[in-house]
């Protein structure tokens, strides 16, 4: 398959290459004849060989020109707190524990541990902290010290495509699909009968409450789509890849769900078969609306399916009471990817497969250790202890429960709660890489 010439400039440069090649052959015709005579080889054979080499060289040059001229791909990352990312930079060292994530560390830290940027990935991120732009680095998470899926995704995509890319990120913590990201074609959220009766019991004005909810419906949908349009319009001016480049919207990642999963008012039958069907319908409509509003009817979309806690089948006994709710919601999130109308253009990624079961077990043991520490410190014998003695008691209990290696693994791997994927850089980078692999399969 021959490379495609994308512009008149490419045609002109290729023509120049061919003209030079022809001139070289003409200039070397007499020396080639003498060489062929001395080597007892036909001039036609040598001439044909040089033509073939010249042709291949021209194709190679054209391939390079085609890569340079091809539009720069732009990917949108949108969702709530886990798309923001709560993995603290102090957990980055744990990336080295996994061959999949280990190479990422060298992209954001040099040999001395100082932070560096990945110049091939440009980011425009809108979140609760405002607008942040620049080359991909630590700090595009929920705060300056945190990362989200953008790190693993950006590194993997730019390497796989072997060209610069742009990420447009829009994420806010605590946001729902049923109201905050509600697709415009679904109309404003309307309270169900159970919610109306609850409002009346609380002595609240139902009409006023409905008006407030209607006003909030789709607010963050509009925020995110406006951010995408504005960012695309400014890329030629702001991105470091040159004003002469073209940019094309190439894919979108949706990573949200917690606020819908825990809302028993909106989903009163949650945990029951079909209890989250409304979420599936809303997400299907959201995808259609997004494609229409972004003028990208076949935009590849990856659904990041909620997976905090890991696979439900591996839940401990104390987690089993959540199993039905968690699994039914995950199934509802993934459902749109199974629709025939979205075949080959929407894929679901089960982020539960990126979970770290070792960290789960260590965190579980830490809870019991903390309970033991609190009980001992409240005992009559411990009330008279000084600060140093209390610290010694904590250390004694810790060493009884954990080896030093286990304790180091826990401290270097966890920085947040389970619903934020433990604030683990290793988990978050795995998720980003998984998103990239799914996206690459659709490009």
Predicted regions and their residues:
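Serine residues within intrinsically disordered or low-complexity segments
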Residues: 7, 21-22, 38, 42
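Bacterial N-terminal signal peptides that target proteins for export
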Residues: 41-57
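Short, intrinsically disordered low-complexity segments enriched in Ser/Thr with adjacent Pro
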Residues: 2-11
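Cell-envelope and extracellular/periplasmic
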Residues: 69-443
